[in-house]
Amino acid sequence: MSRIGKKPVPLPKGVTASISGQSIEVKGPKGTRSFSATDDVTLALDEGSVKVTPRGTSKRARQQWGMVRSQVENLVTGVTSGFKKELEISGVGYRAQMAGNVLKLSLGYSHDVNFEVPAGVTVTTPKQTEITVEGIDQQLVGQVAANIREWRRPEPYKGKGIRYKDEFIFRKEGKKK
C-alpha cells in the first residue's frame, strides 16, 4: 500500500495556505485555489508545509489520506506553475483558430465546430494545427482538453483527428486485396 500521505506538501516561496476546518485555500502567483477535504482526514499547517493525517485507522481514512495529500499538492502546483495540455490536429483541411472566447474547429464536418472556452482556462492556437490548454485547475484543464479531443478522436487507419501531443495512436493495416 502506498504511503504517499505521510510526506508533507512543501509550500514554495510566494505561496500561502490558510486552513479553516476541512477546507484549504492556497494563494500563489498564478491565482487562488481552494479544496474541501473529507471528514476522514485532518489538515494542518506546519512550518512552510501542509500536513495531512488520517482520523482513525479505517480503510476509507487511509484511502482518503493519500488522495487528499495529492489534491493539496495539485493545488500548490497549479498556483505556482499551472497545468498545460497540448493537442495536435492532423488531417487534410483540419484546423483550429481562436475568435474571442470561442475556439473554431474545422474538422471535416459540413459545418465548423464552435467550442466555448469555460472560465478558468486559457486556450491558444500557436499554429493552425496545434491547440494549447492552460490553467491552474488540473481537472478543468484535462476536461477541456478531453472535450476538444472528443469532437474528432484520432482514427486508427490514417491517424486523422485531434490527439494529445504525447499520445501514441495504434495504427491498423487496411484491407488487403
Curated annotation (Swiss-Prot):
The keyword Phosphoprotein does not apply. One of its GO terms (molecular function) is rRNA binding. The keyword Magnesium does not apply. Pfam families: Ribosomal_L6 (PF00347). Transmembrane segments: none annotated. Keywords: Ribonucleoprotein, Ribosomal protein, RNA-binding, rRNA-binding. It comes from the Bacteria. InterPro entries: Ribosomal_uL6-like, Ribosomal_uL6-like_a/b-dom_sf, Ribosomal_uL6_a/b-dom, Ribosomal_uL6_bac-type, Ribosomal_uL6_CS. GO terms for cellular component: cytosolic large ribosomal subunit. Belongs to the universal ribosomal protein uL6 family. Part of the 50S ribosomal subunit. HAMAP family: Ribosomal_uL6_B. This is Large ribosomal subunit protein uL6. It comes from Cereibacter sphaeroides (strain ATCC 17023 / DSM 158 / JCM 6121 / CCUG 31486 / LMG 2827 / NBRC 12203 / NCIMB 8253 / ATH 2.4.1.). The gene is rplF.
